[in-house]
């Protein structure tokens, strides 16, 4: 496929063929950048970055984003530059590079506000909220997420509200407000269902499963985790969590040997991805690890 054909495919929203040859996709981004077509390089990168993220290929994704962002004239391209800055900020976040993630999201926020790009502004606020979550500043997480949701509603852009709603739920959850977090995650699940965002549904089923566990609803947690597992294969990070999810269920039922076995399998899977855990997930690993360690003592 030529770079132009890659871009046409991305515009149609059919990313499955592109997902099969991510190296060629990255080459297409670089080809546009080399000839000075920054607009096409940024658009292709912005439309396809999730193909690398879903496979846990952080270095490859970051490299493709960097190629687009450093193309001659990239600083003048509205919309797609903000989207690509946000994407690279997320790659940096997952890699544990807080500084680069903050810089990318801050730059995206400034650029989006300058160009009156509501979606870009919401994305950037979400990225900054994600960093605050890792910093343990849960009040700031909720504040930034609510700002983004209000901006999305003012613009009439439901799609732009989806990510900050997820971050608001995470902030509330890490404050220990599990009933309120459940309501927000349910709202997020309903919104993504309405928008047809199938890729985001397993994430919220996963989160709801953990909230139900903390509320003592083991059967409900099992249902959520089982529903998440029906989407196995779509996201390397989420799939690696499956064993840890079931370890938590086993521990809640007092099945300690099974819990330890599944926990070891899950942690091996996560470590093989070389990804910095999302803060809400890290808190659950710490919680479950402490429970399992207490049994051994």
Show the residue positions of the predicted features.
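Short, well-ordered secondary-structure microsegments
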Residues: 2-75, 80-85
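Tandem amphipathic alpha-helical repeat scaffolds
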Residues: 8-10, 42-55, 82-96, 120-137, ...
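Alpha-helix C-terminal capping/termination sites
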Residues: 14, 18-21, 33-34, 54, ...
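Amphipathic alpha-helical segments of tetratricopeptide repeats
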Residues: 29-30, 69-70, 106-117, 146-157, ...
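Solenoidal tandem-repeat scaffolds enriched in leucines and small polar residues
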Residues: 150-164, 170-176, 180, 190-192
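C-terminal non-catalytic interaction modules
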Residues: 256-297
């Amino acid at each position: 496929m030529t770079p132009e054909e890659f871009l046409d495919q991305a515009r149609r929203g059919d990313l499955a063929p592109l997902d099969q040859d991510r190296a060629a996709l990255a080459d297409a981004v670089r080809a546009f950048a080399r000839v000075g077509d920054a607009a096409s390089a940024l658009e292709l990168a912005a439309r396809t970055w999730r193909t690398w993220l879903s496979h846990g290929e952080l270095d490859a994704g970051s490299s493709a984003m960097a190629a687009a962002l450093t193309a001659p004239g990239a600083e003048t391209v509205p919309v797609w530059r903000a989207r690509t800055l946000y994407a690279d900020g997320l790659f940096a976040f997952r890699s544990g590079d807080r500084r680069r993630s903050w810089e990318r999201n801050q730059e995206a926020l400034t650029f989006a506000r300058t160009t009156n790009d509501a979606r870009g502004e919401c994305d950037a606020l979400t990225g900054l909220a994600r960093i605050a979550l890792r910093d343990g500043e849960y009040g700031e997480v909720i504040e930034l997420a609510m700002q983004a949701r209000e901006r999305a509603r003012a613009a009439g852009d439901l799609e732009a509200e989806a990510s900050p709603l997820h971050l608001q739920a995470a902030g509330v959850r890490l404050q220990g407000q599990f009933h309120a977090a459940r309501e927000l995650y349910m709202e997020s699940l309903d919104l993504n269902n309405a928008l047809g965002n199938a890729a985001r549904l397993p994430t919220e089923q996963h989160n709801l499963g953990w909230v139900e566990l903390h509320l003592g609803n083991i059967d409900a947690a099992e249902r959520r985790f089982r529903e998440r597992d029906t989407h196995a294969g779509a996201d390397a990070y989420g799939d690696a969590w499956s064993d840890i999810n079931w370890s938590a269920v086993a521990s809640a039922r007092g099945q300690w040997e099974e819990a330890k076995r599944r926990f070891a399998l899950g942690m091996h899977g996560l470590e093989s991805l070389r990804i910095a855990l999302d803060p809400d997930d890290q808190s659950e690993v710490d919680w479950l690890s402490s429970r399992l360690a207490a049994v051994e003592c």
